[in-house]
Amino acid sequence: MLDQETKKKINDLRDTLVGKVPDPKSQVEQIMIALIYKFMNDMDKESTDLGGEASFFVGDFEKYSWDNLFGTKVSGSELVDLYSTAVESMEDNPNIPQLFRDIFKNAYIPYKDAETLRLFLSQIDDFEYSKDSEQLGDAFEHILNSLSSQGDAGQFRTPRHIIDFIVEIVDPKKDETVLDPASGTSGFLISAFKHIVNSNSEKSSGDLLSAAERKKIMKNINGYDISPDMVRIGLANMYLHGFPEPNVVEYDALTSEDRWNEYYDVILANPPFMTPKGGIRPHNKFGVKSNKAEVLFVDYILTHLKPKGRAGIIVPEGIIFQSGKAYKEL
């Protein structure tokens, strides 16, 4: 459970950004990259404090360390230039893992106001990297609450209680593969992992699972999303929930055939059911003839379940009550 002090810190971050970054998704992205930036510096500091060496801010990237952003001789314009350059070039940092490079892919700072940036970074500085992934994950989930309204292409962030309810009903097991073909912020994937861990607990969380079993469970959990921005947010969310190498990729399940032959025991989804003007142009492998997103996603999910597989899908009521041929075929 997230404490009130941490909630206030997160709300203050959004309040600081809202004048320069009014879009909620952009606010989340700015907070996300700043937190990962800060946490990389914290991990470097932890390593050097223990007698080791820094891993992330070394070589050509040493000048971008978090501490250098707060140097007493750094002017406002220098801070904007330093931080902006660091964020935009971080995906090319050879010293950071691929996951972090993916999170920083195409990242940039959409404002140049030094006062706003200095305040924002000082607020980020209050957050510290913790090996307690539950605490970090809960904090990021609170940030993601701002995405609950409709976004591009009919995307919605599914409320946590609905996600958990569906996952509980579908009941994924520790040896089963799980997919969300429209994973967004990765809420279903994280809930599925927590459900499996809790189902294998006796005295403490996941105490009936070996380290190898936990690793396998994480490897079995997969997500696709058509939006590169949502992939980055989903990757960060999973990382902050303890996934060292989350399996979320940019992929359009309705128009690409590259992953058509992949099948899963469990599929969980709340797909974006808004069909673009002119309809979708799907490939020829679908069992129903339609250019409607809701029809195609349901058909995709049913087709990609393994024998005896199970699915939990949030669908518009039209799937049940429409009388068109494609709806009836489903």
Residue ranges and their predicted role:
Residues 20, 318-321:
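Short strand->helix junction
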Residues 146-147, 278-283:
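Gly-rich Lys/Arg/Thr-decorated short loops/hinges at beta-loop-alpha junctions or inter-strand turns
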Residues 175, 305-311:
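Short glycine-dipeptide loop
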Residues 296-307:
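A short glycine-rich, Lys/Arg-flanked "PGG" loop and its adjoining helix->strand segment in the class I
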Residues 323-330:
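Conserved Class I S-adenosyl-L-methionine
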